[in-house]
Amino acid sequence: MGATRLTNTLTSTLTTVLAVLALAGCQPATGATPDTAPQPATPVAASAARNLLAALPVRAEDTGAHYRRADWGDWTQHGRGCDTREQVLRDQGRGVTVGAGCRPGCPANVAPCWVSPYDNTPLRDPVAVQIDHRVPLKEAVRSGARTWNQQQRQRFYNDPTNLVAVSAHANTSKGDKDPGRWRPSNHATWCAYATAYVATKHTYGLTVDPAEHDGLVSMLATCR
């Protein structure tokens, strides 16, 4: 997808996607300190996600053989010396302290500051928290991002609506798998996970393969 087309796609779908994410309890990073556990997606968000999923092209994936992690860059710097990872740790945690250089911390006298939504694992050490791309980088390449330029890849890599603070075990288990091959062991998060996943695919003009589509349908069926 060319730069102009991707920009137009992002602009035209941003309002819809942000509304879906907000209703699903998957807010973009804002500097707030929400509860550690994501809120269940509302029926309105689930309905919107089903409509977005129905609009996604269903086709066989690229092999992804041309994927190179180095092509996607690293976390970008934001205000007050914070990078994207540090912002996600701050925004998706509870009771998080911010030290010199925007270094997040978790005081010993409070409950663990993070709970991995994929497996309900409580986490206290910020170094042990990993940041997952809900739609994996390699999955993006397999489903339409092969021709993106560096700016487009960097934007996707740092998009907070696609980032989740999780346990190392959950992140390793998931790897670059899509919902046709992997789903969170915590079934309570399936609805919110699928809702946000579909929104990201729609925002970036990506496709889904048949198994991935069916996996998303199954997860959205858990929405109440």
Kindly give the residue locations of the regions a language model identified.
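Domain-level detector of nuclease and nuclease-like folds
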Residues: 114-224
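Bacterial signal peptide processing site
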Residues: 27-30
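Intrinsically disordered, low-complexity proline-rich regions
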Residues: 8-11, 83, 158
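C-terminal motif of bacterial Sec signal peptides marking the signal peptidase cleavage site
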Residues: 23-25
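Cell wall/extracellular polymer interaction/catalysis modules
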Residues: 36-114, 130, 139
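Bacterial N-terminal signal peptides that target proteins for export
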Residues: 1-14
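Sec-dependent N-terminal signal peptides
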Residues: 16-21
